[in-house]
């Protein structure tokens, strides 16, 4: 079972929207609440605004309407952040001239964290995602796709974020490696209990990882369903072979089909 909540971070959206220049509406009238320490997946078709939602939560975009609260900050149409946020993108986005450890250290450098503690924090983050001291000295081109994604995850975790945002991080990986990283992510979440928001278009992955699943319509994105996933943690790959798992996947898939109709 997960540990009890260790932080008060949460995310609350009230009628949030995003309209880009030219009038394209990416997200329309979205409302939801995510409590501290929850693991919530957001599923929907490509182009439905899932990534836009994450970027607004991260403060990389400003909503064009509604109220979005992230942590303790509240402002109409503006994202205010309280506490640390980690972001894992679909592409690892590693700096090619830096080693794995140097890439992981970048958020600490930008935060001007004390130099005397950086090395130990980087080593801890790399170890947490299953990378060795030898891996830490390699540049991205010397690492496999799965290892680069582990470095990206370690970089997001090194600041010990209260909120962890993941934008389809495993979408480009093969099924076996994807399952391995799903299990690694679950282990890390159970150990640290950040508020995790995981974007994916893979329903099976969402059911396997999340406590709740928010179903999003095709663009402009609206949330039509908030599905509670009943399975206890820790979850194991064998769960995917059960009838209960298949029924849960079927329920979410049916919601997606109805949302698209």
Language-model segment annotations:
Residues 116-134, 187:
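Conserved ABC ATPase "signature" region
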Residues 101-109, 119, 123, 228:
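Short helical segment in ABC ATPase nucleotide-binding domains corresponding to the A-loop/adjacent helical element
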Residues 58:
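Helix-to-loop junction immediately C-terminal to a conserved catalytic motif
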Residues 73-89, 98, 110, 115-119, ...:
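ABC ATPase NBD coupling module
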Residues 160:
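Conserved catalytic motifs of ABC-family nucleotide-binding domains
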Residues 43-45:
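The feature captures the beta-strand-to-loop junction immediately N-terminal to the Walker
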Residues 139-143, 147:
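Conserved ABC ATPase signature
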